[in-house]
């Protein structure tokens, strides 16, 4: 099953005949593999780890699958397809990345849902691309085409990072935020509640849904001897977290994980402001899986503490998995849930 943007690309796949194709920011479908019907070869770079895991089992000699904020090589392509990102500030970064990998006069295709901001594509395209031309309008999506007409500046993460000081209960820390990663540039209420009641931890600790590394840096500021692991599904968040830790002279293991699936062993502590805020059935089930898996991966005497929107149905799930839990603090928007393993 292809998403609507992918169906629009298939409608126009004749422009890819015998091309070496790169697909950037692809979705959780098999579009890159489907393009092998016409393309010479396809490489796919996912910025969402779920999307990578969906496609990776289909890799073959003509289809290479990658996850991250950049490719691990400098290969050039006849066509680069960009899925317009949900986080609009990420779009210019993806265009710069596309330009690094296009042959001279190579083809750029940009697809996105009408409501997702792709309509502003012509204004957003950098000057090293020709003016964007609308190629198709179908499935509530738009497809634009362009070509590389000039040399693009070399891509440097520092050009796409905002760095700022953040005051936390543990002291001031430096945060590095790449484009496309959510940031309020001040401590949000949920994280502030969590950090204001941070337990004393020891040993191996997991920061689930680490984002740009705010909780990780605050944790290590207060408790620098922790063996910390930071996981997320977003490539830009993981890169931001690594930059944040480096800026503060801290070290932790930072890696992608689908829930806790890519973690191993048990933890002495699990801390999170989990990224489940919308109350949708899909994210509620992910949240429930996180709670259930956490219960299995907590060491004896291990501490589990998360902050969550008080209107979300966490209490029943947590009570079912952990039995007894405490609410050390709450306000009108958030609750702090805490549990210590027997």
Curated annotation (Swiss-Prot):
Question: Where found, per UniProt?
Answer: Cytoplasm
Which InterPro entries does the entry mention? DNA_methylase_N6_adenine_CS, Mtase_sm_N, rRNA_ssu_MeTfrase_C, RsmC/RlmG, SAM-dependent_MTases_sf, Small_mtfrase_dom
Q: Which domain of life is it from?
A: Bacteria
The entry lists its GO molecular-function terms as: 16S rRNA (guanine(1207)-N(2))-methyltransferase activity; nucleic acid binding
Q: Which GO terms describe its cellular component?
A: cytoplasm
Q: Where is this chain primarily localised?
A: cytoplasm
For this protein, the record's Pfam families field holds: MTS, MTS_N
Record keywords: Ribosomal protein included?
Answer: no
Q: List its EC numbers.
A: 2.1.1.172
As its record notes, the protein acts as a catalyst of: guanosine(1207) in 16S rRNA + S-adenosyl-L-methionine = N(2)-methylguanosine(1207) in 16S rRNA + S-adenosyl-L-homocysteine + H(+)
* Similarity-based family: Belongs to the methyltransferase superfamily. RsmC family.
The protein's job, in short, is: Specifically methylates the guanine in position 1207 of 16S rRNA in the 30S particle.
Q: What is this protein called?
A: Ribosomal RNA small subunit methyltransferase C
């Amino acid at each position: 099953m292809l998403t609507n943007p992918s169906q629009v690309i298939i409608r126009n796949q004749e422009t890819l005949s015998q091309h070496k194709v790169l697909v950037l920011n692809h979705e959780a479908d098999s579009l890159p593999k489907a393009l092998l019907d016409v393309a010479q070869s396809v490489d796919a770079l996912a910025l969402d780890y779920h999307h990578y895991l969906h496609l990776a089992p289909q890799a073959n000699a003509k289809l290479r699958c990658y996850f991250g904020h950049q490719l691990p090589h400098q290969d050039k392509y006849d066509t680069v397809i960009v899925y317009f990102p949900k986080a609009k500030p990420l779009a210019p970064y993806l265009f710069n990345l596309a330009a690094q990998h296009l042959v001279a006069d190579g083809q750029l295709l940009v697809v996105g849902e009408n409501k997702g901001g792709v309509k502003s594509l012509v204004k957003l395209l950098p000057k090293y691309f020709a003016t964007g031309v609308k190629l198709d309008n179908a499935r509530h999506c738009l497809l634009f085409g362009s070509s590389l007409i000039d040399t693009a500046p070399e891509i440097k993460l520092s050009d796409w990072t905002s760095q700022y000081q953040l005051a936390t209960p543990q002291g001031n820390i430096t945060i590095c935020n790449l484009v496309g990663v959510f940031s309020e540039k001040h401590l949000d209420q949920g994280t502030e509640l969590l950090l204001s009641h941070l337990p004393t931890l020891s040993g191996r600790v997991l920061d689930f849904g680490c984002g740009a590394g705010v909780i990780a840096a605050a944790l290590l500021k207060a408790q620098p001897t922790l063996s910390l692991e930071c996981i997320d599904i977003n490539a830009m968040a993981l890169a931001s977290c690594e930059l944040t830790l480096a800026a503060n002279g801290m070290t932790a293991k930072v890696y992608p994980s689908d829930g806790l699936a890519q973690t191993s062993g048990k933890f002495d502590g699990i801390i999170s402001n989990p990224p489940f805020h919308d109350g949708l059935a899909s994210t509620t089930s992910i949240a429930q899986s996180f709670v259930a898996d956490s219960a299995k991966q907590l060491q004896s005497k291990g501490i589990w503490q998360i902050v969550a929107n008080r209107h979300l149905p966490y209490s029943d799930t947590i009570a079912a998995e952990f039995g007894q839990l405490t609410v050390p603090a709450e306000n009108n928007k958030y609750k702090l849930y805490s549990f210590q393993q027997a």
